[in-house]
């Protein structure tokens, strides 16, 4: 019987699911495992600068990967604990990261040896227990016979639930053999079928609400993206012609060039015409909602109707009634078979708000502002772009822009760990290399956030991520924090860097750097056809006033300050 090592089995499983880049760092408890990655044709080891960045990179990769999956490998204790921030972010934002940790050998654990990287108390499962709180499921493997099934179980759960999973793999098991034939049976990635009786009740109730509605809207959020419901959402818009809106976390969940797209709804922080359109609706079909503070304008949704249908990844809610086990993908597919017949015969498609992204004419020498930047940038985006925006001015500014067709938006609105996007850009760029090297990956990051995770630009240079644009918004420190509290406080200051020296510092081969500070320089940059071609890694430092911020961020900062001060 043909056999392969358990280590190779793991990487072959990843390869079957089109997870062909593995992130992480080597350590003495995972070295034998890492040898096996080179035995699988088409796979590569990213080799990150540190574990936190590796976790962010894995998160970004998963958001671009067709199966919504990624993988990373770290070492016991000192390596894996550096991942906790990144893995917690992936858990909160529903991202399927397969987190494998190389742990000491089974015999060392049994003897409770006082090994390095331990707490010195013989407890080898303490870190596993920590990760249980931020993992959908986990396996601390101890037996070679059950190991393949445990690996498959964790990978399946990462896909189905779109959340991180933890696998602890002892160093002595890596080279043990398992039947190669196990790979012939693919992992079952099918979703649990909905309860037929509950689903029938859901569909009939939704159809009745649709038949009675004269002003329905569709509101799409992040989990529609994470749980692969974009095709169903697109079909629902096409079949019903209902106005559709997204949340900040839902940007790129729908085609924003669709004439039925009305904009981004952020509660009280929405544009007035968007706020009126959503809140005056008599039926709201909410798909994949994640109702966090920054995603809802500090919970300021002002629906005037009680006719709200919420489709989620593991339940559906209609008004006050919850239907556990009726997940949205199957429910939407079922609804689509009849929804057109359910529409009120007197329904006339309601006009959607129109947003004209045109800046007020200004002299070329006019200093650049956030408002001008975020209005102008939409005209430079093109179909298929992967657009990544850092927590702060970028994540709020991008809300007012329009994404082109087939774009992917990445922003950590819920978890909000500053510096996340630099690592995520590395992962997204490497995923894009595998899918389409001509697909542009565009990062907008503040000068303060950049300083937390800047090392991962080195990894981008190593892998020649020449599809990458790094826009560094230099507003001299932590503007979002200044807006919330401490405008003049020293703790919101940072040491200025010579940012344009970073690419040569990291030994980039083909690169380009620019610094812009005026309206004319931005216009010229976006008019430059050569600049639009993704043939080298580029960094553009965008000089902006310190307290200049998108209007919605200024308003959100006031709401956040109020929330923080409440007793």
Curated annotation (Swiss-Prot):
Keywords carried by this UniProt record: Cytoplasm, Decarboxylase, Lyase, Magnesium, Metal-binding, Thiamine pyrophosphate
Catalytic activity: a 2-oxocarboxylate + H(+) = an aldehyde + CO2; pyruvate + H(+) = acetaldehyde + CO2
Residues binding pyruvate, per UniProt: 28, 117, 481
Cofactor(s) of this protein: Mg(2+); thiamine diphosphate
EC number: 4.1.1.1
Protein family according to the UniProt entry: Belongs to the TPP enzyme family.
PANTHER family from the UniProt entry: PYRUVATE DECARBOXYLASE, PYRUVATE DECARBOXYLASE ISOZYME 1-RELATED
Annotated protein name in UniProt: Pyruvate decarboxylase
